[in-house]
């Protein structure tokens, strides 16, 4: 179904969704296909969808209104919710167990970041004080909640959020993802709402993996280490970057969308294995007893040592000074002990035990874990050494067979998981609606 009309420069076509399927076109501005939008207008050399037309109209209307009626205040742009540090901390406490120092640091940093954005909208030209952006570096072992902290912050502030693995990034021209891919993912997360994307949060995981491989200059390029750090500098600090909406290398012919990164908050996280030894060596120069006691430890992390991390330590680890300087807020996370893992299982709003309980409730069954079962889950997770991630792995391995059988079992009102079930040495206890034991058929 097409409808043609004459224009001054030639023919345009209005391509309505639901045509005969013989023509596949994409918006030259946002990259959406004709099937994803209500209408697509085709010009001699380009296409534009109805959503981009509306966005363009809104922009032009505001600009014309400002010129013709300067006394009229323009419509307020999208601004994230400005939440106080205490409110941010209270929200984080509902989902993240422990890590009080890191949560406080994040709460203040995020509050100041979005307060800075808010002040920019009403800043006078004669105001000489310009508040710089403060991106965040989270340092802590695997499974301590770095990603969860960033995700929870984005949900609280109602801003777009995306996660990227730093190990997939390489310099432009090499196999892997360009750094612009980071912004493309945020653009998708915002449903191509540019104004929202420019105030979103990006979490870059495994940032320690792009540390320089060696302190010595090599004749071969370090395309996934220092090269990526150099490529990330401009988007971390704030620049207008041309972003390919479908990804950079598979569709080189596509139109670029310009994103200004000056108000995007970047949170980088990494385990930084071995960093504690670098810190201990530095400290031991002035306090031999303290330093030697740390380096004698066989376990990787000492939380007390990590609290003393400095930018110089990160430089020695392999991050370049320019990159470190663009992540001024440093916060460390502690390894999770047995008490913390036990709390993670049952206390947060989205605790694993509560999630499984909800799934069983949908089948009309009450789920219960005995205290001994929970202790056994924690013990196995500690043995695996991957923090909170191990909890889900242990439970999923145990629960999958139970959840496979349960929907076809009749008359079950309650399912009790014991320590023997966790160790795969016994069956769950099934009770009927009256509380009587029920054997599995």
Swiss-Prot record:
InterPro entries, per database record: AAA+_ATPase, ATP-dep_Clp_protease_ClpX, ATPase_AAA_core, Clp_ATPase_C, Clp_protease_ATP-bd_su_ClpX, ClpX_bact, P-loop_NTPase, Znf_CppX_C4
- Which UniProt keywords are given for this protein, alphabetically ordered? ATP-binding, Chaperone, Metal-binding, Nucleotide-binding, Zinc
Q: Where is the ClpX-type ZB domain?
A: 15-68
Q: Name one GO molecular function term.
A: protein dimerization activity
**What is one process in the GO biological process aspect for this record?**
cell division
The entry's ATP-binding residues are 141-148
The family database entries (SMART domains) matched by this protein are listed as: AAA, ClpB_D2-small, zf-C4_ClpX
Q: May I have one GO cellular component term?
A: HslUV protease complex
What SUPFAM superfamilies has UniProt attached to this entry? Answer: Glucocorticoid receptor-like (DNA-binding domain), P-loop containing nucleoside triphosphate hydrolases
Report quaternary structure and partners.
Answer: Component of the ClpX-ClpP complex. Forms a hexameric ring that, in the presence of ATP, binds to fourteen ClpP subunits assembled into a disk-like structure with a central cavity, resembling the structure of eukaryotic proteasomes.
What this chain does, per the record?
ATP-dependent specificity component of the Clp protease. It directs the protease to specific substrates. Can perform chaperone functions in the absence of ClpP.
Protein name (record): ATP-dependent Clp protease ATP-binding subunit ClpX
